[in-house]
């Protein structure tokens, strides 16, 4: 055995005890509100098409699958949970393992714990208030600041993300030391996202959580487009102390529109020489059957616990980080 091998957990036993207490409190939060806890598969025959997500892939070989069946570890339980909603589950939540074949570091681990929940008949604002309630309970923090994506951009970059052109975006990127990257990027939306990541995120949610809502419609993902302003989507994200904690939507219910978005993602993947991903036909069938009007959110539990315990890094609050797995 290598002398550098460490069998010990990355988190202290004291932190693991505190972690267990926080997870128990999260469960109470939802059971007290009549939200059903569910479990869904960790693997699927389909996966996300989002160009910024990298799923793990494996092969299932068993009876009737002599040549093997490609399976994907879930980056989120979203698709399966929406199928439950379409089947009439009512409000549901899940605490589960999710997997993303991406970086490992202070705020990232390729295997992580996700809290995801869905509220039929909630709009985006009502769900944001419930997320705020949960954060105040777990983090003992102040009520969050609420600002639109447009307001955040104007405040910190003095640019309107809904109307700014690519030349102005590249000029702003140059001021942030990102000129070399920006000059090679021709997609306007990617430039907007880059400026938000490096020019806005570091400045919000420092003293209390910040909810940023009404993302550009080009970043709608699985969210509805706002009926009041078609330039924006009913999507929000939550930030606190430099960490992205949660991502929520008023959920898209139109199966045809969702298929178009998946296909558009795959076209973007092809343009970037990324593998095109299999579209989840089961999800689309559920949407066609009828997904109730609802809002949903995914929250990173390890990051939440890291903040609650004032830990320096994720490995301080998970039993075994990927380096010790």
Curated annotation (Swiss-Prot):
Query: By its UniProt entry, which Pfam families does this protein fall under?
Result: tRNA-synt_2
InterPro entries the record matches: Aa-tRNA-synt_II, aa-tRNA-synth_II, aa-tRNA-synth_II/BPL/LPL, EpmA, Lys-tRNA-synth_II_C
**Recorded E.C. number(s)?**
6.3.2.-
Which reactions appear under catalytic activity for this entry? D-beta-lysine + L-lysyl-[protein] + ATP = N(6)-((3R)-3,6-diaminohexanoyl)-L-lysyl-[protein] + AMP + diphosphate + H(+)
BP GO terms, sorted: lysyl-tRNA aminoacylation
Q: Name one GO molecular function term.
A: ATP binding
Q: Would I find Ligase among this entry's keywords?
A: yes
The UniProt record gives the binding positions of substrate as 76-78, 118, 251
A GO cellular component annotation here is:
cytosol
Positions bound to ATP: 100-102, 109, 244-245, 300
| Keywords annotated in UniProt | ATP-binding, Ligase, Nucleotide-binding
Q: Briefly, what is this protein's role?
A: With EpmB is involved in the beta-lysylation step of the post-translational modification of translation elongation factor P (EF-P). Catalyzes the ATP-dependent activation of (R)-beta-lysine produced by EpmB, forming a lysyl-adenylate, from which the beta-lysyl moiety is then transferred to the epsilon-amino group of a conserved specific lysine residue in EF-P.
Q: How is this protein organized at the quaternary level?
A: Homodimer.
Q: Which family is this protein grouped under?
A: Belongs to the class-II aminoacyl-tRNA synthetase family. EpmA subfamily.
| Name of the protein this chain belongs to | Elongation factor P--(R)-beta-lysine ligase
